[in-house]
């Protein structure tokens, strides 16, 4: 694997032999060898001529209408029937938006997790990335709004740019919740969103970003191996955009993406990660990543 998680920072990966943990029974963000985020950040290895090191924050989106439907109907009925529809009487889940509970979840994550992290580090992430799905765009807005409001170095009118990576999406195919709406619709709904503190959220798409979803297929559900390959290509795209100095990185994405990232980074599994939760990883990135191309 070209990228590698570095152990010894968080409860999710204390040592090389660790077999994983259940996030419902453990504080998976616990700092195991450092008193706070600043001390942890300062302990991340310095860049060398061969490797760079990044603090990667992976935020799972809050509860979407599809997540609520899974709780309502059960996974068996969801997979067999409801996932193939675009919604029910409780809401639509084609490229699902967040439920009111989902918005509340990620607001609390912003106030209770991201804000203390940013305050202790004394800075916002150097670069923000996101999945293109609407539940992730809404999660970024709702979770980072309270952080931006409390960050004096970010005055009203500041543009906050988030780079969209099309490949870092949830498992593709069959389930309509994972089909992206037209690009123009998402832009109309979310581009240049004004936060409560007056910051402007700007989504940065590739110049040739497709209007329609070219990845999702109605008759094939992506396998784990297929997703891991796609996710690895997404990680290449992400890390290739970073300079040496851009070390603190945020990605708003999905449970499936997070699990795939963990596998690609040779990181122990994190079980039962709830909607709206955050995972942090120190990542070793080879300097010649850009020369390796896509897989």
Task: Give the role of each language-model region.
Residues 1-160, 164, 173, 224-231:
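Active-site-proximal alpha-helix that buttresses catalytic centers in soluble enzyme cores
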Residues 51-59, 129, 246-257, 261:
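Beta-strand elements within well-structured catalytic alpha/beta cores of enzymes
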Residues 142, 260, 264:
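Active-site signature of alpha/beta-hydrolase-fold catalytic machinery across serine-
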Residues 227-244:
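A short, acidic, amphipathic alpha-helical segment used as a generic capping/interface helix at domain edges
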Residues 163, 168-169, 179-218:
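Histidine/lysine/aspartate-rich catalytic loop segments that bind and position anionic ligands
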Residues 78-81, 97, 266-292:
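Domain-level recognition of soluble alpha/beta enzyme cores
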């Amino acid at each position: 694997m070209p990228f590698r998680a570095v152990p010894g920072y968080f409860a999710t990966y204390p040592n090389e032999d660790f077999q994983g943990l259940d996030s419902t029974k453990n504080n998976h963000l616990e700092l195991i060898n450092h008193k706070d985020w600043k001390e942890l950040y300062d302990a991340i290895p310095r860049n060398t001529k061969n490797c760079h090191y990044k603090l990667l924050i992976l935020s799972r989106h809050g509860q979407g209408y599809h997540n609520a439907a899974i709780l309502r109907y059960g996974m068996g009925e969801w997979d067999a029937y409801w996932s193939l529809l675009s919604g029910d009487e409780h809401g639509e889940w084609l490229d699902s938006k967040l439920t009111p509970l989902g918005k509340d979840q990620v607001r609390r994550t912003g106030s209770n997790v991201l804000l203390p992290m940013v305050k202790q580090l004394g800075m916002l992430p150097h670069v923000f990335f996101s999945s293109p799905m609407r539940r992730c765009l809404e999660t970024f807005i709702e979770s980072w709004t309270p952080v931006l409001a409390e960050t004096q170095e970010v005055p009203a009118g500041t543009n906050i740019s988030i780079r969209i990576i099309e490949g870092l999406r949830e498992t593709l195919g069959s389930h309509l919740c994972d089909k992206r709406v037209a690009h123009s619709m998402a832009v109309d709904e979310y581009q240049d969103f004004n936060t409560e503190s007056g910051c402007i959220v700007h989504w940065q798409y590739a110049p040739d970003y497709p209007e329609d979803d070219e990845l999702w297929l109605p008759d094939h559900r992506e396998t784990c191996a297929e997703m891991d390959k796609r996710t690895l290509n997404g990680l290449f795209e992400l890390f290739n955009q970073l300079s040496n100095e851009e070390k603190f990185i945020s990605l708003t994405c999905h449970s499936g993406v997070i699990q795939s990232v963990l596998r690609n980074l040779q990181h122990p599994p994190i079980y039962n990660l709830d909607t709206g939760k955050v995972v942090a990883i120190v990542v070793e990135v080879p300097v010649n990543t850009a020369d390796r191309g896509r897989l």
